[in-house]
């Protein structure tokens, strides 16, 4: 093994250890869609039980990721029934995929010398946002990692592999399509041989996943793309779920990349070394700023590109001042490590390491109850719960917050919802009706003091994101279920 390969191996080991430590020691959900759009649908495919959100009632999501998760869940069921087993295995695989950011950063900086490669790869290994998002089971994150690797491979002349990864990224997150297309256009321009190689690698992937899989899953090719656009853009679902100002993403970048002016200058300098990546990041931010509904995860492609471009910018700056080559990389590495640690552990971003922790822990506690025959859930929005993903028991769940056909202001369609057990719908009793049918469940998740006289608390949980809300408790009443 060469010295540079050994250096990269050490960085990858550090990066993977940090990412695994994050999800093994910090129970958190990056976003509720992670549970209900992907884990929950995988659980439903594997075991027949799960909450079915409107996206899967209407068929605007690809079944690719849920099917992959379902396979892992079935395999882990041969070992044990702990839901954290399959959750952590899937998170571990996603964390392994996230290491492509470290590889790309290191390899792109090698031209400036060993210390430049260590600085850039090291920054990608320890940057807090990359560690936080790495284990996330979200198409935005997985597609971004595929896209980053594709752009680097295309730059190395491996167009067919790049095309295959671009096709996969497009099928996972078609909203990244314009950004990746702009980046590839910069790389390839009028080189028709490279375009042909990209098409040879990418078109079969797109046809197989977007065309055939959607046809088998939903009855029409590419339905997860065109119906998604119809529902969210033309029928107003996306905007009805929330609007943010055009300053939403700049405000996040100001916090996540503080001190932004210094790091932004490094990004600009680094963009000269990897312009395609800078184009992809810039187009992602511009296009998503124009969309009313904004969430940080939507622009993860830009967030992942940031540390690479910052490292390349610092590497170019160090190269310009030879007298700094021995001292600057070490000093910059220490400073960036401390900065990453500070941003991860100080408000306002520190609270997200415990996002929905109490909710997940309550469902995990219910999983461990041998006498469980039915579970009631109060005081939590249905998509903030752990669902069957974290309960992983073949018993009915009854949600107080249940609307079978939610109508959002500004949207022309109703969002249909269902709870399935053994492939059959579980009748729900929303609102006050849940208390009237407590014979159907003998365990109840509710805020402390809101369970009723017949229920005794077994364990209570809280987290930083609950604020002043009462702890969330798992309660039990004597007897079984009617």
What does each of the following model-derived ranges do?
Residues 31, 58-61, 129-142, 296:
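Short acidic/glycine- and proline-prone juxtamembrane loop motifs at membrane-interface regions
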Residues 8-16, 203-208, 274-278, 282, ...:
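Signature aromatic-anchored transmembrane alpha helix within multi-pass, membrane-resident enzymes
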Residues 10-17, 118-120, 124, 166, ...:
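Transmembrane alpha-helix segments characteristic
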Residues 104-107, 122-127, 142-165, 305-309:
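Specific aromatic-rich, kink-prone transmembrane helix
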Residues 174-189, 194-265, 277-278, 289-290, ...:
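Membrane-lumen/periplasm interface segments of specific transmembrane helices
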Residues 13-16, 88-115:
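Transmembrane-helix motifs of polytopic, lipid-linked glycan transferases
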Residues 27-28, 215, 323-473, 477-480:
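Catalytic lumenal/periplasmic loop and adjoining terminal transmembrane helix
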């Amino acid at each position: 093994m060469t010295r540079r390969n050994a250096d990269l191996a050490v960085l990858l080991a550090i990066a993977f250890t940090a990412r695994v430590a994050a999800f093994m020691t910090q129970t958190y959900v990056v976003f509720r869609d992670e549970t209900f759009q992907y884990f929950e649908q995988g659980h439903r495919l594997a075991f027949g039980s799960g909450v079915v959100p409107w996206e899967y009632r209407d068929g605007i999501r690809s079944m690719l990721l849920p099917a992959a998760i379902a396979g892992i869940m079935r395999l882990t069921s041969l070992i044990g029934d702990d839901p954290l087993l399959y959750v952590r295995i899937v998170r571990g695989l996603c964390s392994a995929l996230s290491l492509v950011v470290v590889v790309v950063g290191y390899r792109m900086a090698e031209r400036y010398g060993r210390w430049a490669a260590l600085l850039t790869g090291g920054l990608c290994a320890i940057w807090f946002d990359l560690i936080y998002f790495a284990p996330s089971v979200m198409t935005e994150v997985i597609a971004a990692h595929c896209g980053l690797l594709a752009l680097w491979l295309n730059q190395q002349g491996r167009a067919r592999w790049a095309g295959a990864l671009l096709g996969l990224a497009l099928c996972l997150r078609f909203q990244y399509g314009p950004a990746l297309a702009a980046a590839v256009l910069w790389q390839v321009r009028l080189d028709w041989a490279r375009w042909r190689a990209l098409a040879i690698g990418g078109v079969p992937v797109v046809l197989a996943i977007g065309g055939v899989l959607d046809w088998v899953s939903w009855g029409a090719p590419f339905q997860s793309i065109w119906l998604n656009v119809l529902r969210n853009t033309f029928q107003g679902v996306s905007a009805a779920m929330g609007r943010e100002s055009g300053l939403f993403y700049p405000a996040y970048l100001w916090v996540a990349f503080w001190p932004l002016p210094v790091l932004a200058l490094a990004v600009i300098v680094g963009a000269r070394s990897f312009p395609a990546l800078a184009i992809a990041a810039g187009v992602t931010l511009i296009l998503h700023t124009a969309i009313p509904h904004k969430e940080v995860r939507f622009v993860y492609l830009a967030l992942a590109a940031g540390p690479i471009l910052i490292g390349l910018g610092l590497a170019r700056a160090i190269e310009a001042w030879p007298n700094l080559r021995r001292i600057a990389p070490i000093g910059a590495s220490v400073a960036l490590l401390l900065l990453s640690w500070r941003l991860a552990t100080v408000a306002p971003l520190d609270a997200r390491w415990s996002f929905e922790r109490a909710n997940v822990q309550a469902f995990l506690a219910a999983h461990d109850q041998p006498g469980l025959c039915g579970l009631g859930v109060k005081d939590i929005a249905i998509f903030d719960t752990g669902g069957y993903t974290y309960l992983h028991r073949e018993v009915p769940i009854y949600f107080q917050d249940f609307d079978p056909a939610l109508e959002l202001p500004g949207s022309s369609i109703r969002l249909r919802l269902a709870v399935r057990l053994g492939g059959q719908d579980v009748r729900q009793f929303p609102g006050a009706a849940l208390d009237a049918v407590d014979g159907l469940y003998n365990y109840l998740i509710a805020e402390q003091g809101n369970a009723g006289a017949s229920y005794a608390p077994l364990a209570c949980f809280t987290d930083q994101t609950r604020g002043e809300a009462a702890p969330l408790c798992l309660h039990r009443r004597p007897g079984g279920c009617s």
